[in-house]
Amino acid sequence: MSSLFITATGTNVGKTHTTLKLLDALAAKGRSVGVFKPIETGVLDSAPDATILLESCRKVNRNFEGLKTEDITAYTFPLPAAPFCADTNHKIRIDRILEKYHQLSQLCDILLVEGAGGLMVPVTRDFFMIDLIKELQTRVLLVTPGRLGCINDTLLSMEALKSRNIAFDWCINLYEDAESFTEVTQPFYDAVFPAWWSDKEGMEKFARSL
């Protein structure tokens, strides 16, 4: 079993969108795909991200047909905030997240793990999302936006991953400012990262590499 952790430069950048596209691309190649959303905040009645992930996964993996959203999440909280802030009772246990991860790993040959927020989002007081990635020992797909200011956020995220020797790939989700991207961002990416790719082009090729 292999796994891939989908993270981003921040919140509302497109982790769920990218995870769903990758799920479809992998399933189209005959892979048995699973999904895991360790922590979701801003949950009142049902976890929106986990729900849509599970609905899509059920269509391509029978092992997930009988599961509920709480089966593919470890913790949910009503407050839309970083896990440490949303967890007002401080009940998050990393070993519970790892246990869920290993349980779901038995149901697929590749598990897509969607993070919350960005790499330095606090899960507990001294444990961050990037630390969870290290614990899981998984490869990473970093999702970045194309809007003005994203170069700085992208480079900082890359530096964080490199400093911890975490292998990663990255893609651009051109959902914002797609028209201005060619002027305000693309020139730098073309000069420094000529092999960059977006979620609209290159997802199938990336899926073949997993």
Swiss-Prot record:
GO terms, molecular function: ATP binding; dethiobiotin synthase activity; magnesium ion binding
Coiled coil: none
Pathway it works in: Cofactor biosynthesis; biotin biosynthesis; biotin from 7,8-diaminononanoate: step 1/2
Cofactor(s) required, per the database record: Mg(2+)
One Pfam family it belongs to: AAA_26
GO cellular component: cytosol
Residues that hold Mg(2+) according to the record: 16, 114
Binding-site positions, ATP: 12-17, 114-117
Subcellular location: Cytoplasm
Keywords, alphabetical: ATP-binding, Biotin biosynthesis, Cytoplasm, Ligase, Magnesium, Metal-binding, Nucleotide-binding
Its EC number(s): 6.3.3.3
Taxonomy, superkingdom: Bacteria
Catalytic activity: (7R,8S)-7,8-diammoniononanoate + CO2 + ATP = (4R,5S)-dethiobiotin + ADP + phosphate + 3 H(+)
Chain positions recorded as substrate binding sites: 41
Family, as annotated: Belongs to the dethiobiotin synthetase family.
PANTHER family: DETHIOBIOTIN SYNTHETASE
Function: Catalyzes a mechanistically unusual reaction, the ATP-dependent insertion of CO2 between the N7 and N8 nitrogen atoms of 7,8-diaminopelargonic acid (DAPA, also called 7,8-diammoniononanoate) to form a ureido ring.
Protein name, per record: ATP-dependent dethiobiotin synthetase BioD
Species: Sulfurovum sp. (strain NBC37-1)
Underlying gene: bioD
